[in-house]
A protein has these predicted regions:
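Conserved, well-structured interaction surfaces
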Residues: 45-59, 82-154, 172, 176, ...
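Bacterial Sec-dependent N-terminal signal peptides
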Residues: 1-29
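An aromatic- and glycine-enriched ligand-binding surface/loop that stacks and positions planar moieties
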Residues: 21-83, 187-190, 201-335, 452, ...
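Flexible, polar/acidic helix-loop-strand segments at domain edges
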Residues: 82, 87-98, 304-370
Length: 495
């Protein structure tokens, strides 16, 4: 009993319920008890809005941890601060004592999990319009599956929240059991959501797209292909013409965005400023660029890996003393004197080109894009036709169409019969700095050891690393959660 009292404040935080305004993400939180709540359609909508809120926490989607997870791969590094997190990203840590980024993001995702589960438990009993109820349940299922996915990719097996069984919060399911829950939850969402949806909310494309990514993790290639091609054949989604435009406020709700978490100007997200260099801390609009936290920056390895003519390079990275950037109305050569590497991520700089508007620029977080789904489709086709991580040079002509849609948009020549090596390149360059896909890809492909361990040190900011698959395939589980459970929750292997 004492164990439960210690753990409940973290995993079973009361649902935040919010009043109605025009923007469902701008509502103010209020708490209600089940005795007076879960009675009307308005309350159901209010509860659903509360499910989204934790994803906008500082360390959650688009926040510090979401940006910093990129440093586990070979695309990025952390400039300073958060020594415990840096130790994990350099595969030196034997414990996860990082109480800010890692643990706080874990808590934020579990807040969403708890609130989504409450919606799924209570909304079915409300007398309301059937179509509205179906949509609410679909969004809750998507957000539940999405949050579990983000955590499972990091930590493996998870406690599965059950409002009827509080003790379940103290026991981790196996990885297979956890992925099965995610799969089932997203399948439910595919039966409840519609292709048409409001901005900032998931639709049917998001549900099928996330399901395709889950199947790829599980190596269920036929299922991954079917899920991805359900999105493709719908005709509801397409690539934005210019890659750079995707990361602008003007195009943040394009058909390419399957799920983009809505922004609150002046409040959320802080993604752009986390990537901006810090030329003058506390200065007023220093030129030519820099009033950021310089939390995460790009590696020389990434900068040099772009193929000649790849338009994604200019839209993603810039080199000190070489590349011209526009910031706060001025165009000049990048300086970034305080960056440890000469490379800066400029992917989210667009809101600041004309004017620096504060740390929260109002740019939606691109949580899932159509390009990702196209590349999952190509990957599934390759694995079904002799290509894959162990046959990386095998050509697979059947993957040409989805593969080349992405490659052509980047300004590169099409490849008639792409290989898995070609796919690896496209996924790296297409999805850089979008929540750690590079690292998660290399891990699920079983290639992290060979690629990471072969990389030389890049200054002191990105040292040579030793990735041990039996340990580093998963991050160490947050020590705070283990302690709060009095050891009922177990650490990942070999930590």
């Amino acid at each position: 009993m004492n164990n439960m009292k210690k753990y409940i404040p973290i995993l079973m935080i009361p649902v935040l319920l919010v009043s109605c305004k025009k923007d469902f993400l701008d509502k103010q939180p209020h708490e209600f008890t089940d005795a007076v709540f879960w009675k009307t359609a308005a309350q159901a909508e209010s509860a659903l809005a509360g499910v989204y809120t934790p994803l906008q926490d500082e360390e959650a989607l688009g926040g510090e941890e979401w940006c910093s997870i990129e440093t586990f791969g070979d695309n990025a590094y952390m400039n300073d601060n958060y020594s415990d997190y840096i130790a994990m990203s350099e595969f030196r840590a034997l414990q996860n004592n990082e109480g800010d980024l890692s643990h706080n993001s874990y808590v934020s995702y579990y807040k969403t999990i708890k609130r989504a589960t409450d919606v799924l438990t209570n909304v079915p009993g409300i007398s309301m319009d059937a179509a509205q109820k179906k949509r609410i349940l679909g969004e809750a299922n998507f957000l539940l599956g999405f949050s579990y996915y983000e955590l499972a990719a990091r930590y493996g097996g998870l406690p599965i929240y059950d409002s009827k069984d509080p003790a379940a919060a103290l026991v981790r399911k196996t990885e297979a059991e956890t992925w099965a829950v995610i799969e089932t939850t997203l399948k439910n969402a595919t039966t409840q959501l519609a292709w048409e949806h409001e901005e900032g909310r998931p639709g049917l494309g998001a549900a099928w797209g996330m399901l395709a990514k889950v199947y790829a993790y599980e190596k269920k290639w036929s299922d991954a292909k079917t899920a991805a091609e359900t999105v493709i054949s719908s005709g509801k989604h397409s690539l934005t013409t210019s890659y750079a435009d995707i990361f602008t406020i003007q195009h943040e709700n394009d058909a390419e965005i399957l799920f983009g978490l809505g922004a609150r100007l002046g409040e959320y997200p802080i993604t752009p400023v986390l990537m901006l260099p810090n030329n003058v801390w506390g200065g007023t609009h220093p030129e030519p660029m820099g009033e950021g936290w310089r939390l995460v920056s790009a590696t020389v390895n990434l900068y040099n890996a772009y193929q000649v003519g790849d338009l994604r390079k200019k839209a993603t990275v810039a080199k000190r003393g070489v590349d011209v950037i526009t910031y706060n109305g001025s165009t000049d050569i990048l300086q970034a004197p305080n960056n440890q590497s000469p490379i800066v991520c400029v992917k989210y700089n667009a809101p600041y080109k004309d004017e620096y508007t504060g740390w929260a620029a109002g740019l939606n977080v691109p949580a899932l894009r159509y390009a990702d789904v196209l590349l999952i489709d190509a990957e599934a086709i390759m694995n079904l036709n002799g290509g894959g991580p162990t046959t990386r040079t095998t050509t697979v002509a059947a993957a040409t169409i989805p593969f080349n849609l992405v490659r052509r948009r980047a300004g590169l020549a099409t490849i008639a019969a792409p290989t898995f090596n070609d796919l690896m390149y496209e996924r790296r360059m297409e999805l850089a700095f979008e929540g750690g896909d590079r690292h998660f890809d290399l891990v699920r492909w079983g290639l992290a050891e060979s690629i990471y361990n072969a990389l030389p040190a890049e200054g002191t900011y990105k040292p040579a690393r030793t990735f041990i698959p039996t340990r580093h395939r998963l991050l160490p589980y947050p020590q705070g959660e283990i302690d709060n459970s009095n050891g009922s929750i177990k650490q990942n292997p070999n930590y």
